[in-house]
UniProtKB/Swiss-Prot annotation:
One of its GO terms (cellular component) is chloroplast. Its main location: plastid. This is DNA-directed RNA polymerase subunit beta N-terminal section. Residues 383-393 have a biased composition (Low complexity). Keywords: Chloroplast, DNA-directed RNA polymerase, Nucleotidyltransferase, Plastid, Transcription, Transferase. GO terms for molecular function: DNA binding; DNA-directed RNA polymerase activity; ribonucleoside binding. Belongs to the RNA polymerase beta chain family. PANTHER family: DNA-DIRECTED RNA POLYMERASE I SUBUNIT 2. It comes from Chlamydomonas reinhardtii (Chlamydomonas smithii). It holds the Pfam family RNA_pol_Rpb2_1.
């Protein structure tokens, strides 16, 4: 007892001495620094604290060595500090003003030592980061990319040229702030100005001018847009990633509708070539092993014709493709239909172009043949005034106005019919050039077909090619390798693709959706500019036969303006803001992905901005969506919440991002993991984010595995997941472990206390009904919470936030008073 009491007295003496020294250091530091009082009130714009390097309070402790990078979310009820860290997450407040959830130990030197494992439980990024980052990418790269694709715009004779310089574009400050736009029912937009150069080669004139293109809606700091006084959110869209995917479909034939077992079955293998913009192409092998190229609203084309039409020769095709006899099956005679003529064998691209044109435009050719017969009948009918033995050409007879004067019709009534028949007669001569243009515009024109860099990477990886990422159209090598792989898939030498796997699906964020719509507006703008330049150069003169019978008002009206304005062509006359503004107005006003923001409570707003929709343009519909699309896939772990989804027709089609998930630059969803090195969880090295494709190559442990004080896993065998299989391995074989148990669920679901004991159906209802709760007048802390409540409110932007670090002296719902060290 004597030894114990002596030791206690010694420790108290040491603590007293150290406290005296720390107090002296504190007074010296305060005397050298100047305390300034800063008042922060609630303004129109949301204010965020960039960082709080340290917090100093009037206690006998020194916390200068603790780095708490925070955004200063403050509790209106107390005058202490509630920390929300962009790096370490949300903490509760204790009496000392320091995070209570952090295990802090006071040493004899009065310094705090932070226990690292508890800190790393809260490494959650900003919840609205997906919206802000996508819009930043639009301003940084998207606008420049879309204008660069339209350069240059020329007339038909190439004598006039419009060239944009998007790298130097400027945005003006918005006319209204977000709050003013809401009050006055205006839009929170900025005007876009771009330098434009007009070159007239015929007159050797070059003009350069800043031009107003249109209005760009701006995103607020809370991640939404304000149009006509209404807050709108652009929902993120989940679509199939551009690339090539091999699948099969099994067909069953039943003898009658009452039979239980199918009479026979057959399998069709096909490859879907998906692009960002343009026509989707399917290469399909039918039950007779015939391979066809298929497109929407176009008859199927033999694959041999298609490969030769894109520039390959028959020798290259037959030598490269495995079991090349399959390519010739659809050129053989059909034993089931012997009357049908076999398709011809082509060797050169011009022959293939003509053959494809005959198939694609078969209906048009039949109509032209009927017109030709009508012409022959018309030419054989003599005129009423004079009979001729020798037939003359229709163009020569049209001058006499006596050609088609049959059954009492006057010559003037038949002029219009005759001119149409003459036009059809000219179109009867099919040229291979027309087929070549059709193939080029469908798959090889960068203005009409675009794989994107993501699609090019997927093509190269799947087909083992090394084509440059700058080439975003289909190449002959792509189609040849795709056909060869389809044959290998049908023989079981290649694996099929799982289209529901997240490695084959990507997210179109709000910035990308706006960029696509900007491209639509620029296509319309390009069309109007080209029409104006063509008219100004005198190339829009109409044929005399069509122009002769127009009314005097129509003849006097000019499609662009009068002749004087056409001769004095300027950049301002060429560029109009209507196409650009109209395209954006259509998207924000009528698109199903642009929705009125849910503002019932902060959680509803936050969830709305993190929503993922599989519907919309280029997506699926409620009626066509199958259970496979709506279901939960193993790759959703840590990326898409398996609980939070609507009830009804939209079940599984509308989802939410998980709490830790983020979207990378390519549009794939990533989730974080800790690295494990020789059985030790390396939390200090930071987080490793993996997409669904990268996750297939690693061995993952559960996030709730027991670890020692220094981070070592148990020596016993540990359950892990490898791709979709579960097994047990030693701790030295584990590569990564999860970050936290809430990694697999969304923010709304993570607010449910004791979620693991809840029924799945009730948890789904609870996640959705939390968004319908009406906020109370006097907010209070939850009696039972999960620790993410303050973080959800702070990221939604509904609370006052401090803009600098310091000592909090007073907080309320209207103002924050801080003493800061400067």
């Amino acid at each position: 007892m004597l030894n114990i009491s002596t030791n206690m007295m010694i420790n108290q003496t040491l603590n007293f001495d150290s406290n005296q020294e720390s107090q002296k250091n504190k007074t010296e530091r305060i005397s050298k620094t100047k305390l300034t009082r800063e008042l922060i009130t609630k303004t129109d714009h949301d204010i965020y604290v960039d960082d709080i390097s340290f917090l100093q309070r009037e206690d006998n402790v020194n916390v200068s060595q603790i780095d708490l990078t925070a955004r200063g979310v403050l509790n209106p009820e107390d005058q202490g500090v509630l920390h929300k860290s962009t790096e370490f997450g949300v903490f509760n407040k204790n009496k000392t003003g320091l995070p209570a959830s952090v295990d802090l130990k006071i040493k004899q030197n009065s310094f705090f030592s932070v226990k690292q494992p508890d800190f790393n439980k809260y490494l959650i990024s900003d919840f609205v980061e997906i919206q802000r980052n996508s819009f930043f990418t639009l301003l940084e790269k998207g606008i420049i990319e879309e204008f660069s694709k339209r350069n240059p715009i020329t007339n038909s004779k190439k004598t006039m040229e419009i060239f944009f310089y998007p790298d130097y574009y400027q945005l003006t400050p918005p006319e209204y702030s977000p709050s003013q736009a809401i009050i006055k029912s205006k839009s929170y937009t900025s005007k876009l100005y771009i330098p434009v150069q007009l070159t007239d080669k015929s007159k050797n004139i070059i003009k350069l001018k800043w031009v107003y293109i249109g209005d760009i809606p701006l995103m607020t700091k809370r991640g939404h847009f304000i149009l006509n006084g209404c807050a709108r959110v652009i929902v993120n869209q989940m679509v199939r990633s551009p690339g090539i995917y091999y699948q099969k479909k099994i067909y069953e034939n039943f003898s009658n509708k009452w039979s239980e077992k199918p009479e026979n079955t057959f399998t069709r293998y096909f490859a879907d070539l998906i692009c960002n913009r343009g026509t989707w192409l399917r290469i399909e092998m039918d039950k007779y092993n015939k391979i066809w190229a298929q497109m929407k609203r176009v008859p199927k084309i033999p694959i041999m014709w298609f490969l030769i039409a894109v520039g390959l020769t028959d020798k290259i095709v037959l030598k490269t493709v495995m079991d090349s006899k399959i390519l010739l099956y659809n050129l053989d005679e059909d034993p089931l239909n012997p009357r049908k003529k076999p398709l011809p064998y082509v060797k050169t691209p011009p022959a293939a172009w003509s053959a494809i044109y005959n198939i694609v435009f078969a209906k048009k050719i039949k109509a032209q043949e009927k017109a030709k017969k009508m012409l022959e009948l018309t030419e054989g009918n003599p005129s009423s005034k004079s009979q001729t033995k020798n037939k003359t050409s229709a163009s020569k007879k049209s001058k006499t106005l006596n050609v088609a004067n049959t059954k009492g019709k006057t010559p003037a009534e038949n002029i219009k019919t005759l001119s149409e028949l003459i036009d059809l007669e000219k179109a009867l001569f099919l040229k291979s050039e027309q087929g070549r243009k059709w193939i080029f515009n469908k798959f090889m024109n960068p203005r009409t077909y675009d794989l994107g860099k993501v699609g090019r990477v997927n093509f190269n990886r799947k087909l083992k090619l090394s084509i440059s990422q700058d080439i975003t159209t289909l190449t002959p090598q792509d189609l040849l390798a795709a056909t060869n792989n389809l044959i290998l898939v049908s023989k079981g030498l290649r694996e099929l693709d799982d289209i529901d796997h997240l490695k084959n699906r990507r997210v179109r964020t709000s910035g990308e959706l706006i960029q696509i719509q900007i491209g639509v507006g620029l296509v319309r703008l390009e069309k109007t500019i080209r029409e104006k330049m063509t008219y100004a150069s005198g190339l829009s003169s109409l044929p005399s036969q069509k122009f002769a019978f127009r009314s005097s008002k129509q003849r006097n009206q000019s499609p662009v303006g009068d002749a004087e304005n056409a001769t004095q062509l300027t950049i301002g006359n060429l560029i109009n803001t209507k196409p650009f503004n109209g395209a954006l107005r259509e998207f924000f006003g009528t698109s199903p992905l642009s929705q009125f923001m849910d503002q019932i409570n902060p959680l509803a707003e936050l969830t709305h901005k993190r929503r993922l929709s599989s519907m919309g343009p280029g997506g699926v519909t409620r009626d066509s969506a199958t259970l496979a699309i709506r279901g939960i896939h193993p790759s959703h772990y840590g990326r898409i919440c398996p609980v939070e989804t609507p009830e009804g027709k939209n079940t599984g089609l509308v989802n939410s991002l998980t709490a830790y998930a983020r979207v990378n630059a390519a549009g794939y969803i990533e989730t974080p993991f800790y690295r494990v090195y020789k059985g030790q969880v390396q939390k200090k090295t930071g987080l490793y984010f993996f997409s669904a494709k990268q996750e297939e190559k690693i061995k993952l442990g559960a996030p709730d595995l027991y670890t020692s004080e220094i981070g070592f896993l148990p020596k016993a065998s540990i359950p892990v997941r490898i791709v979709e299989d579960f097994t047990k391995i030693s701790r030295n074989e584990i590569q990564y472990v999860g970050v936290a148990p809430i990694q697999m669920i969304s923010i709304a679901t993570s607010l449910i206390p004791f979620f693991e004991h809840d029924d799945a159906n009730r948890a789904l209802m609870g996640s959705n009904m939390q968004r319908q709760a009406v906020p109370i007048l006097k907010p209070q802390r939850p009696i039972v919470g999960t620790g993410l409540e303050a973080r959800a409110v702070s990221d939604s932007g509904h609370v006052i936030t401090a803009k600098s670090s310091g000592i909090v002296m007073y907080t309320s719902s209207k103002e924050i008073i801080i003493y800061s060290l400067q």
